[in-house]
Amino acid sequence: MIEKLMHKYALSKQGASDMIKAIISATISNIILMVPVALLYYLVRDYMAGNLGDKVLFYVAGCLIAFVLIGISTYIQYNATFLSTYVESGVRRVTLAEKLRKIPLSFFGKKDLSDLTSTIMNDCAQMETASSHFIPELFGACISTALIAVSLFFFDWRMAIAALWVLPVSFLIVGCSGKVQKSLNKKQMVLKMACADGIQECLENVRDLQSYNTQEDYMKGLTGKIKAVEKHAIVTELGTAVFVGSSQMILKLGIATVALVGGVLLAKGELDILTFFMFLMVVSRIYDPMQVSLQNLAAVIASGVQSDRLDEILSHEVQEGTNTMKHDGYDIEFSNVGFSYETGDVVLKDVS
């Protein structure tokens, strides 16, 4: 698993281990956020039973414990996610620079300066954002939601299905858009590289452009490249928004199906009001983080282009050879050397 994460997200071995820790901490943090929901459920149950007065201290202590647990889990999640991410960021940049120093020169013949500069700067920055904001939150939300979903079936399987059917459908919509998003992002990257290459070329040849009075013609072509990047950026964002927006709209249908199925079962007497109330609370708590998870999933898919570019360099074969050189038979010897001027003044005589 660690090896797969290393190639998937261009991580070091330690970075992959830290990524797993960040996912676990995000999962635990999300589960702890359900503690207030559980307290509210038991509060309503005791209130309806008429014995709330005997358990005031229990709920006060429960609120304090929940507050402490949320604070501790958030602190651990922050350290496991953000601090480790930026430590890994430094390792990634140094490793990338060392790799560029050791790989064969034939690799650089296939790349231009703007491409390599973008890989070192922009791609690394994009993967930093993905590692700190998108990936741990996405996997943590999926794992915690799966655990909560399993627990819902122990209360009422019909209500659980009504609440959860929208989750796989929503993720399937965003997941199936992966090829479209990757295609759009690859084209966007090509246009960005062409634009960056044009700007770099302009800076290097600005004197020649002025000498031949071709600034206006060159700037027209460069302006066209910039506009092409802007236009395709709109298309890329729109393509992502169509899938994410559609999946979020379907996610909202879960609240309606829970209310509808719960109302029917309640009218038939097959469901008590307390369980109905609990499911309404749970779906309101689950769906909001899952909307963010859908955006994170789209962002993770989009960052696959940058990850592939980094992995191309990090996985490239290193130039073979030795780090030390042994000089055998190449000594320069200064033996019996003499030197004098034409006037006969001797400067050196039999010097070794």
Where do the PLM segments sit?
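Cytosolic ends of transmembrane helices, especially the final helix of ABC transmembrane type-1 domains
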Residues: 214, 238, 285-313
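Transmembrane helix-loop-helix hairpins at lipid-water interfaces of multipass membrane proteins
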Residues: 19-73, 153-158, 270-273
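Hydrophobic alpha-helical transmembrane segments of ABC transporter permease domains
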Residues: 24, 28-36, 41, 121-166, ...
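Membrane-integrated ABC transporters
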Residues: 1-33, 52-59, 77, 81, ...
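Primarily ABC-family ATPase nucleotide-binding module
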Residues: 314-352
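Hydrophobic alpha-helical segments in the permease module
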Residues: 59-74, 167-171, 240-254, 273-295
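An intracellular "coupling" helix at the cytosolic face of ABC transporter transmembrane type-1 domains
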Residues: 10-18, 105-106, 122-131, 135, ...
